[in-house]
Amino acid sequence: MAHKKGAGSTKNGRDSNAKRLGVKRFGGEQVTAGNILIRQRGTKFKPGINVGCGKDFTLFALTNGIVKFDYANGTQKCINIID
């Protein structure tokens, strides 16, 4: 028999890298077509006028203009690009 306890293993000791999510262009900012507006998981913000949605739910500008945050249907947050 061993005279000392063996070192135990642990299931902790790792962490994932930050994914840099969030708003990248704020309300009132001037943007050009293709600029990323928001990186998100799921549709926290929905795409509005002149805004496209990528397969990972990234919202991006389709035209040049000014960013405007708004509500669609009174409850759902959305983002528009105003000319």
From Swiss-Prot:
Record keywords: Chloroplast, Plastid, Ribonucleoprotein, Ribosomal protein
Compartment(s): Plastid, Chloroplast
One Pfam family matching this protein: Ribosomal_L27
GO process terms (BP): translation
GO CC, alphabetical: chloroplast; mitochondrial large ribosomal subunit
Ranges annotated as spanning the membrane: none
Protein name according to UniProt: Large ribosomal subunit protein bL27c
Organism in which the protein naturally occurs: Phaeodactylum tricornutum (strain CCAP 1055/1)
Gene it is expressed from: rpl27
